[in-house]
């Protein structure tokens, strides 16, 4: 059954002007920051990719928006979390798995990606707001945060690299079969090295390395000025300032732009359905 109301993501355009977004991606460094996120929950509007919802549920952190893009594997990441989903809003793409409508999200916000031919044709007739599709939930979250008007965007768990061979905050370990190959599920993936925020080289998957480049282009295209990455070991991403989570409040006050308390309250996660 679907009790969710469905809206266009563009309905929220610039509604969060001047506020701070925290985008939670699924990398292992997320685990270092869970307690800090909890302690500072009122400082951010939280966007979480669907893969981290189980980790957040276990830690009682309710995101304001859950961002879902995978066309196929969404169901397994959300199974059994329907009660938790009812507390959060969903941002999905027109191509996302329709199983999302059965997950009892509070509200659904639909994004129409620009590089989908069908959507392009529709948009010509319909003037739908089409957004750059990132191809991943993390990129969709970034695009959404920019369109919604956030002036600061902070990432946690955006590692795009392995930490002692751990791939995700959920604890999955990479199955390395050689210096250049690993197995993911049943697929063999090429491993490459990329520059880390520490200046060293770190191992990552070849498709992640390509995603890093895509992400850098997206940051340029979206003209994002204040994007922060709190990873302690992950890939260096051009256009993002690397700041540890603990340094964020100090960092903002020293630049004369302190955290603005979150407003636009009717969309907040902990507000219940009426």
Residue ranges and their predicted role:
Residues 1, 57-148, 219:
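Acidic/Gly/His-enriched mid-domain segments of enzyme catalytic cores or analogous surface patches
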Residues 239-251:
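Terminal amphipathic helices with adjacent charged low-complexity linkers/tails
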Residues 52-56, 60-70, 148-169:
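Glycine-rich phosphate/pyrophosphate-binding loops
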Residues 135, 183-234:
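Polyanion-binding loop/helix "lid" in catalytic or ligand-binding cores
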Residues 50-54, 92-98, 231-235:
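Short, polar loop motifs at secondary-structure junctions
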Residues 69-71, 83-86, 171-187, 248-253:
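Acidic, Ser/Thr-rich peripheral helices and adjacent loops at domain boundaries
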Residues 1-16:
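Flexible inter-domain linker/hinge segments
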Residues 265-272:
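Conserved small/polar residues in nucleotide/adenosyl-binding loops
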């Amino acid at each position: 059954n679907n009790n969710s109301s469905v809206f266009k993501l563009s309905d929220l355009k610039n509604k969060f002007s001047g506020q701070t977004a925290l985008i939670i991606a699924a990398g292992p460094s997320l685990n270092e920051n869970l307690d800090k996120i909890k302690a500072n929950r009122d400082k951010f509007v939280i966007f979480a990719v669907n893969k981290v919802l189980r980790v957040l549920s276990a830690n009682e952190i309710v995101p304001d928006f859950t961002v879902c893009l995978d066309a196929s594997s969404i169901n397994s990441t959300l199974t059994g979390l329907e009660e938790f989903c009812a507390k959060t809003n969903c941002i999905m793409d027109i191509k996302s798995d329709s199983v999302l409508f059965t997950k009892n999200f509070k509200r659904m916000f639909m994004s129409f990606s620009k590089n989908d031919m069908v959507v392009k044709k529709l948009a010509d007739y319909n003037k739908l707001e089409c957004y750059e599709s990132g191809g991943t939930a993390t990129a969709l979250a970034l695009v959404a945060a920019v369109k919604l008007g956030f002036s600061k965007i902070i990432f946690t768990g955006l590692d795009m690299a392995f930490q002692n061979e751990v791939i995700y905050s959920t604890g999955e370990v990479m199955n390395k079969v050689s210096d250049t190959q690993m197995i993911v599920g049943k697929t063999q993936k090429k491993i490459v090295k990329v520059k880390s925020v520490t200046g060293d080289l770190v191992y990552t998957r070849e498709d992640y390395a390509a995603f890093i480049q895509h992400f850098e282009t997206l940051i340029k295209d979206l003209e994002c000025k204040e994007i922060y990455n709190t990873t302690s070991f992950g890939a260096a991403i051009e256009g993002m300032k690397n700041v540890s989570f603990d340094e964020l409040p100090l960092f903002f006050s020293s630049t004369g732009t302190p955290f603005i308390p979150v407003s636009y309250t009717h969309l907040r996660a902990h507000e219940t359905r009426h």
